[in-house]
Amino acid sequence: MAVLWRLSAVCGAQGGRALLLRTPVVRPAHISAFLQDRPIPEWCGVQHIHLSPGHHSGSKAASLHWTSERVVSVLLLGLLPAAYLNPCSAMDYSLAATLTLHGHWGLGQVVTDYVHGDASQKAAKAGLLALSALTFAGLCYFNYHDVGICKAVAMLWKL
């Protein structure tokens, strides 16, 4: 209540109420009957939010990509204890695939957010793809020709 009083002192008698209760996002249904449709003073700093039209929103592929990123993250949460409890070659290759994919998608978001310009972004994404492919190939080589990821981590813990 003190916040509403403070806003009304700053924005005028109806400003605080208009700021907090006239927007459909915040206004409860039982309060809307008591509010009158008065124009909101522009000097109070109230702005209307315009949502982007449906045809400008992301594609279905972006939604599936986001969902698959979450699935891989949850899969890693289950794979790590399972690999500790049951170290075998299937776990080693599963970890190699999911860790590489998780790292590739995470670093891809870093490239998207922080690398600017078309040419440099394409070069960074190509370098990331090469790094991810080499990482996966190296982990698979390590799993096939050496002790594997699970046993290597266990050996590191014994040190």
UniProtKB/Swiss-Prot annotation:
GO MF annotation, one: metal ion binding
Gene3D superfamilies: Fumarate reductase/succinate dehydrogenase, transmembrane subunit (1.20.1300.10)
Location of the protein in the cell: Mitochondrion inner membrane
Gene Ontology biological process terms in this record: mitochondrial electron transport, succinate to ubiquinone; tricarboxylic acid cycle
InterPro entries reported for this sequence: CybS, SQR/QFR_C/D
Role this protein plays: Membrane-anchoring subunit of succinate dehydrogenase (SDH) that is involved in complex II of the mitochondrial electron transport chain and is responsible for transferring electrons from succinate to ubiquinone (coenzyme Q). SDH also oxidizes malate to the non-canonical enol form of oxaloacetate, enol-oxaloacetate. Enol-oxaloacetate, which is a potent inhibitor of the succinate dehydrogenase activity, is further isomerized into keto-oxaloacetate.
Name under which the protein is recorded: Succinate dehydrogenase [ubiquinone] cytochrome b small subunit, mitochondrial
Organism listed in the record: Pongo abelii (Sumatran orangutan)
